[in-house]
Structures are given as C-alpha cells and as structure tokens.
Amino acid sequence: MTGINAMAPAPEVVSWAEAVEQDNAPHIQEGADGTRTETAFTEVDGVRWKVVTQFKVINKRVPKVVADRKKWVKFGSCKGEPAGPQVATTYVAEEVDMQFTRNRAGEQILDVQEDKQTAKTTSREHCRHCKGNDHWSTHCPYKVMYQLDEEADADKDTEKDRMAMGMRPDGRQIDRNRSDENTCRVTNLPQEMNEDELRDLFGKIGRVIRIFIARDKVTGLPKGFAFVTFESRDDAARAIAELNDIRMYHMVLKVEWTRPSN
C-alpha cells in the first residue's frame, strides 16, 4: 500500500506587493540540536542583502543577582532596546579561561634585588668602618682591619691632644700618669653623638676633666670611639660599671679602661 503525503497548498498571492513582503519576511528553521537559523533579506542603497543568523536558546540557572541585573533598564546607545545583547553595541564571543603561570624562582631573585636596592636608598643602617649602608658596624667584614687602624690613629691623636691640653680647665697642671689612670675608652660610639651629649652622660657619674672624640682627618666625622678623663679614678670605675653596654641611638656603648700610653 502506497502512502501519499499531501502538502499544504501555498498561500494565494493577491498582489505583487504582498509577494515582495512575503519574500522579505524572515524565515526561521530549527535544527534537531535546538539551533535556529533565521534568514532575512534587507535592502541598503538599492542593493539587496541576505542576512543569515544562527542562534540557540539555552536555559540555565543563574544566581539571583545575575537575573536581577538582566532586568536593568538599558541606557546610552542601547536605550530602549529589548533584553539581551545587541549586535550593534555588544560583541558576544566564546568565554576563554586564562591561567597565569608564575615563575617562582625568578620572582624570588627579583624580590631580593628589589629589597637590596630599597635597603640602599631607604635603610637607616650605616657602617662606621666602610661607610656602607647595607649593614651595621658589628657585621662589617672589614671590622678587624679598621679597628686596628683606628686604635693606631687614636694613640697618636691622644698623645698629641695630651701634649696640647696639659692643663685642666681651671688652669692647673694635669699629672699625665694620673690622667691615664682616670681615663675611660668609649667605643662603638654613634656618629650622631657629640661632645656635649657625651659630657652630659658621663657628667652624671662624676667630674669630667676632658673629653676627646676621634674624628676622621678628611671628613671630620667621628670614628666611633672617644676618651673620657675623670678627676677621680673611682668615678671612672663607676662610669665603666654603669655605662658599659647601655644603648645610645642604634648602638651599644662599650666603656673600658684606656690602655697605658707607655
């Protein structure tokens, strides 16, 4: 038995205007996978164009805030347009997930270099030996060499100062041997500390006869050590006991007996 599929008769075209309008009307075809193909004709500057658009409607669950955002009223170039993206103002493309890889080893090297550069420009660290700004004097790799030179220069400067200042402030002669016995050697002295501050500090212990701060001959900056002479040896001993290992600025003072000149 043979079956014949009867096709619906084509609508009757009354006039040519209706034929043109029917020909220009969009035609929508829906595929098996839910994809819709819309074919339309448009005329621009006397040229007829065929526009084919494919789209697929997908229903998915979204957060409530996303759904509410789709209800916002459009503005600007999209003012008055219906919901959804518009071809004239919105370009819809595939979502691409980007993953940024990080070279941790290279970042660590860069961080160390930046830290060193920052330390050179902003650090308060300062070495009184090599004049570097990346470490303290106690961690200077040339500390031993500089200390030997400083002690040699200090002995020379102290001897000259003793010869030039052989008188007490009141004009009386100072016994050199007695002066050596009553003198304290102060090391690890901050560069910010001057003679007045040193006199105020040691003057609380007893009467100070003389204070000498060793300075660089070229720059005039303190070398980091000084000599304080008391009138009494007992005061010098108390100064060593009370002022040794106290903190001044960023340094810790070392107060001890001076070495005999002979």
From Swiss-Prot:
GO molecular function, one term: translation initiation factor activity
Stored Pfam families: eIF3g (PF12353), RRM_1 (PF00076)
Disruption phenotype: Abnormal morphology (dumpy phenotype), slow growth, sterile and in severe cases embryonic lethal.
Residue ranges of every copy of the RRM domain listed in the record: 182-260
Keywords from the UniProt entry: Cytoplasm, Initiation factor, Protein biosynthesis, RNA-binding
CDD domains cross-referenced by the UniProt entry: eIF3G, RRM_eIF3G_like
GO annotation, cellular component aspect: cytoplasm; eukaryotic 43S preinitiation complex; eukaryotic 48S preinitiation complex; eukaryotic translation initiation factor 3 complex
SUPFAM superfamilies referenced in this protein's UniProt entry, alphabetically: RNA-binding domain, RBD (SSF54928)
Effect ascribed to mutating residue 127 to Y: In ju1840; represses the convulsive behavior due to cholinergic hyperexcitation caused by an acr-2 mutant
Described purpose of this protein according to its UniProt entry: RNA-binding component of the eukaryotic translation initiation factor 3 (eIF-3) complex, which is involved in protein synthesis of a specialized repertoire of mRNAs and, together with other initiation factors, stimulates binding of mRNA and methionyl-tRNAi to the 40S ribosome. The eIF-3 complex specifically targets and initiates translation of a subset of mRNAs involved in cell proliferation. This subunit can bind 18S rRNA.
Family: Belongs to the eIF-3 subunit G family.
Record's subunit section: Component of the eukaryotic translation initiation factor 3 (eIF-3) complex.
Full protein name: Eukaryotic translation initiation factor 3 subunit G
Species, as recorded: Caenorhabditis elegans
